[in-house]
Amino acid sequence: MNLIKEKRDRKVKGRTCANGSTQRSYVPREEARSPTMSLEALMALLIIFAHEKRATAAFDVPGAYLHADMPEGKFALLRITGQFVDIVCEVNPEFKQDVRYENGTKVLYARILKAIYGMIESALLWYELYVTVLLDEGYEINQYDKCVANKIINGKQCTIGWYVDDNIIGHEDETVIDDQIAKIEAKFPGLAVQKGPNLDFLGMELHFCKDRK
């Protein structure tokens, strides 16, 4: 399945992903349901950041799902057909020996080792990996919203809220934010980072004023 969309900055983004609809008959719902930050939690964070005059930043993790491994013992295949077989073989000629024909069409089967986009369990696998990283860094997951995490640093609360791979972070000290983002980037290289007070987050243009608005 191929998806193409125009982003807000006029860039065109394309993605080839799996067709997860074929999995619904055999993947249990509890293995595919991933938490996402609620609107109420997001609004609460923004109000707290503004009221406490916290420094802020937003960042996203490019190709987030692909950082997560498929569970050990789970076997899944990706069926590549037609012109996409040629593209894959152009990238890695070693795959040419594995190409076969089915009803006159080129077909290449590849074992899936990462949580690729489109698979219905990928969001949960990414969530579990990201939470593990935050816990290792000393964060505590909010008991009321599983996509909000807090950590006390230099006597002040540092908060991260995330919606899949889009994150917003706030702390009184901007250098603390830089340090926390650097630690996350050490795990997931290539973060796209924005520094406050002006942020573009989840389709919203945010501006944190010094007068707590």
Question: Regions from the language model: what does each represent?
Answer:
Residues 1-213:
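Long, low-complexity, charge-biased intrinsically disordered regions
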